[in-house]
């Protein structure tokens, strides 16, 4: 988990916000559950109490500060319950949207674009893993024209 967090902190993340979230998440994670990515809201003016989204290999966790930041509300959704994930990019940031199989839609707005893209990519990988049983490898396909040229040479 520490290695993942070091990688996340290199991507314009607020170290204090990440540290606060991870300290509270440690007691919430199930056995064999690993944090894949954490995205923290960054509103245009001042973000005093940002919402955040944590994606793990087992679920999506929404973290919302309550009572002037003195407490935190966690709402989680297992990957089995997720129907799809989406990213909508705007001028001041991106929205990460996911819908459940019971047709509930959740949106976290004002995420930095880079963070929203990484969140979306990780979510798609987890949904693909759940759907197909294995993650699809990144295969560089050779165009048919190159294959035909190789066949003619033989």
Model feature map: region roles:
Residues 1-13, 17-29, 43-48, 70-154:
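Acidic, Ser/Thr- and proline-rich intrinsically disordered linker/docking segments
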Residues 41-72:
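Conserved beta-hairpin
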Residues 33-38:
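A short, Trp-centered hydrophobic/proline-enriched beta-strand micro-motif
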